[in-house]
Amino acid sequence: MAIAENYEDVLKGKYPAKAHAKKVAEWIIAKGGDKNGTIYLEAQKQKLNEDNDGEAPFRQRRYFFYLSGCELPDSYLTYEIATEKLTLFIPPVEPDEVIWSGLPMSPEEAKEKYDIDQCLTTKDVNAHLTSTSESAQSTIYAIPEQVSDHITFISYKEKEFKQLKPAIEYCRVIKSDYEIALIRKANIISTAAHEAVMKAASTAKNECELEAVFLKACVERNAKNQAYHSIVAAGEHAATLHYVHNAAPISDQNLLLLDAGCEVDCYASDITRTFPLKGKFTTESLAIYKIVLDMQHQCINALKEGVVWDSVHELAHKVAIKGLLELGILKGDAEEIFTKRISVAFFPHGLGHYLGMDTHDTGGNPNYADKDVMFRYLRTRGSLPERSVITVEPGVYFCRFIIEPYLKDEEKKKYIDESVLEKYWSVGGVRIEDNVLVTKNGFENLTPTPKEIDDITKLILST
């Protein structure tokens, strides 16, 4: 059985907060940290919208959630490294609040729900910090911009504010079964939503109609939060990588690019599909789709523990160059085109990024100042560890803003046939994105959303 394939059974257990805390503590100790120290984290505060009394949308701090599994706002936690004791502090009952919101979770209920050793109320935080047995001779680890003014670390010998954040970011890369199960569930729900959009596409009159279809399918499956703002781009709008207007009329455009994914218990899915709105590709759009699908198949098949992501990104460019040469859009020697980075005009972004609690998850070590334009926007660099989850999202785009400077450059334009290119502007862009778990000897694709040509066209035409 694949890892966490039985995700519903896995999710009957508790989020592994203590295992995460121990892993973070081990990282700190391995870097020379205090084995008798205490880790301290705060949840996000519930805030009001500016200039009114309505609550702003709440998003839990991921650093706090990773060591607690708790989505309650205004909470705190401590983890005592030597004793491996994890304590959660949640807001106490406030009678005025009960009138409006009902009774909050009690410490007893929290102890039952979360993977913690004890639960106190937020009134006890400072007293607990001062009473920790080893505090006078030990170190408190915290994230400086995430410590409330009323919190005091006065009883600790050392205050360390640099190690905790990178420790958590590093540990988040390698996923537990529970985390993989959450990502699988998010992918299952998002797949149902993508399929609903495909079925509704042929009669849609506006991009926003299809965005609404996606959101409805997620919410009715109790996935009320999106991992990011959906991209619903018809025709040439798909040439804009992060097009988010989602409000243009749909008339004679051939393709729709849908980049959308829901979130389940703070874990993201990130899926892109491009398909013909009426169920039939044009000659040009089909040719580009086949290139991108080939790019993705080859890159996914290259994945396993230890593979260098930069090299897989290069592979995507080489497959794109081969395909664009066959179509006549590019001309000349494939190796020269690769070396001179001409393919970046058509594939300007990175092949993918780590996925987890954030859509662009931590630990990727990107270099946005890289002088090599092929790698500047590659959000993950270096080798991929086992149990990391990476998005594989190759694309080919016809963006005038990006391509036209190449056509004005005497050295670069000789590799592009403008007369052939002219036929492809209306394609806009094609991107196909899956969420892939890296295993010791290969991979597991967590995204079951249809993408093969026959599968998507049959689905669209079935309505």
From Swiss-Prot:
GO terms for molecular function: manganese ion binding; metalloaminopeptidase activity. Mn(2+) 2 binds at D259, D270, E433. Catalyzes the removal of a penultimate prolyl residue from the N-termini of peptides. InterPro entries: Aminopep_P_N, Creatin/AminoP/Spt16_N, Creatinase/aminopeptidase-like, Pept_M24, X-Pro_dipept-like. GO terms for biological process: proteolysis. Signal peptide: none annotated. It comes from Pyrenophora tritici-repentis (strain Pt-1C-BFP) (Wheat tan spot fungus). Mn(2+) 1 binds at D270, E393, E433. Binds 2 manganese ions per subunit. It comes from the Eukaryota. Its cofactor is Mn(2+). Pfam families: AMP_N, Peptidase_M24. It is an enzyme of class 3 (hydrolase). Belongs to the peptidase M24B family. Its EC number is 3.4.11.9. Keywords: Aminopeptidase, Hydrolase, Manganese, Metal-binding, Metalloprotease, Protease. This is Probable Xaa-Pro aminopeptidase pepP. It catalyses: Release of any N-terminal amino acid, including proline, that is linked to proline, even from a dipeptide or tripeptide. The gene is pepP. Gene3D superfamilies: Creatinase/methionine aminopeptidase superfamily (3.90.230.10), Creatinase/prolidase N-terminal domain (3.40.350.10).
